């Protein structure tokens, strides 16, 4: 029979899931961070990743709507503000669009979503469905991938600035903000999970939620790797740098 874990034991199990399954282990990220991708491949990554960025505040709004405690809502709503900002020129979504602009992508194309890989779209929609349909505890637990974000952000920024002459620190401003936002958010979510996962069944659910979220992130990179690295099978309507030259700024 499975024993109830202490809060610290539960945290250790959650961190072990991240150490094994977080997308920093994916080969595509190794290529990205070590300068092994060309400009078109980096563009494809940024364009597809925007779909995930765009849906983060939708995910957080869905979670917020299920919170009955005003104090809890006041804390969680900061996540929405972080990404939506106070204006169209502020926030995480705007900063990601600044990155795609800097990479030479047409903003209308990026925002339209019409050049996405199907795998990207399906993975992001699966995540939105999860937080809407599962328990509040599971939805919050699914955000715990942010525990592992600062490490990959540091690798990404350092690697991209070192290896890609078409990337600047200004273009990567999104990640600078996440270095403070992600630890704040994950500390709160981890405390919530450790406090409320107070049965064996609930502890199994929160571990499964983190496992699922890791698979969402991994699936997006699988789609990118198959399409833009090897074997190079691109959905006919997805972004192709050479073919879409007319849709990408010089």
Swiss-Prot record:
Keyword Oxidoreductase: yes
Biological process according to GO: pyrroloquinoline quinone biosynthetic process; sulfur compound metabolic process
Domain of life: Bacteria
InterPro entries: Haem_Oase-like_multi-hlx, PqqC, PqqC-like, Thiaminase-2/PQQC
Reactions it catalyzes: 6-(2-amino-2-carboxyethyl)-7,8-dioxo-1,2,3,4,7,8-hexahydroquinoline-2,4-dicarboxylate + 3 O2 = pyrroloquinoline quinone + 2 H2O2 + 2 H2O + H(+)
Enzyme Commission numbers on file: 1.3.3.11
A Pfam family: TENA_THI-4
Disulfide bonds: none
Pathway assigned in UniProt: Cofactor biosynthesis; pyrroloquinoline quinone biosynthesis
Molecular function, one GO term: pyrroloquinoline-quinone synthase activity
UniProt keyword list: Oxidoreductase, PQQ biosynthesis
Coiled-coil portions: none
Function field: Ring cyclization and eight-electron oxidation of 3a-(2-amino-2-carboxyethyl)-4,5-dioxo-4,5,6,7,8,9-hexahydroquinoline-7,9-dicarboxylic-acid to PQQ.
Family: Belongs to the PqqC family.
PANTHER family per UniProt: 4-AMINOBENZOATE SYNTHASE, PQQC-LIKE PROTEIN
Name the record gives this protein: Pyrroloquinoline-quinone synthase
Species of origin: Xanthomonas euvesicatoria pv. vesicatoria (strain 85-10)
Gene it is expressed from: pqqC
């Amino acid at each position: 029979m499975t024993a109830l874990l202490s809060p610290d034991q539960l945290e250790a199990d959650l961190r072990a899931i991240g150490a094994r399954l977080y997308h920093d282990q994916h080969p595509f990220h190794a290529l990205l961070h070590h300068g092994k991708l060309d400009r078109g491949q980096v563009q494809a990554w940024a364009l597809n990743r925007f779909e995930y960025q765009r849906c983060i505040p939708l995910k957080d709004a869905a979670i917020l709507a299920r919170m009955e405690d005003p104090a809890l809502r006041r804390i969680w709503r900061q996540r929405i503000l972080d990404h939506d900002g106070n204006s169209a020129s502020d926030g995480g979504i705007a900063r990601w669009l600044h990155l795609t602009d800097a990479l030479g992508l047409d903003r209308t194309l990026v925002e339209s979503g019409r050049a996405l890989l199907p795998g990207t779209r399906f993975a992001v929609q699966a995540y939105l469905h999860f937080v809407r349909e599962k328990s509040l505890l599971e939805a919050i637990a699914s955000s715990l991938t942010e525990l592992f974000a600062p490490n990959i952000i540091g690798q990404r920024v350092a690697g991209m600035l070192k290896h890609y002459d078409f990337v600047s620190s200004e273009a990567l401003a999104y990640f600078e903000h996440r270095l403070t936002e992600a630890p704040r958010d994950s500390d709160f979510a981890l405390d919530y999970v450790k406090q409320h996962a107070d049965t064996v069944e609930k502890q199994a659910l929160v571990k499964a939620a983190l496992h699922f979220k890791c698979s969402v992130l991994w699936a997006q990179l699988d789609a990118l790797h198959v399409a833009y690295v090897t074997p190079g099978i691109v959905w006919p309507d997805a972004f192709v740098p050479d073919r879409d030259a007319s849709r990408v700024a010089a």
